[in-house]
Amino acid sequence: MKDAYNNLYNDFFYHRHNGFWKDCAMRKLPALLDSTRMLACGEDLGMIPACVPEVMRELRILSLEIQRMPKSPEKTFDDPATYPYLSVCATGTHDTSTLRGWWEEDRQMSERFFHETLHCEGQAP
């Protein structure tokens, strides 16, 4: 019975709605994009519908890349050199602490970043 509910849940939230999200995006976003000369950036972070990368590619909406929030669950930090050409790289979002706040709030994590990503030796400042 539990598997049946899980299957229903997964189908409803991750498959059935994917087409709905894409149809709505392709109907609404072009008008918004055509109304300005500004570059659009999508906050494609966290759990997003599977159609989001495809829609963003088709509409040439820039991806948002945050080094301390890699899109791959296997990574702790991302490498900006690997980001897509059509992307914006930032140190955080409105949902995260400031760069300084992040650096100070978890010394273990900032030490890891200092050594593994910045390739620096000694104690992190």
Q: Language-model segments: which ranges?
A:
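Catalytic cores of glycan-processing enzymes that make or break glycosidic bonds
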Residues: M1-P125
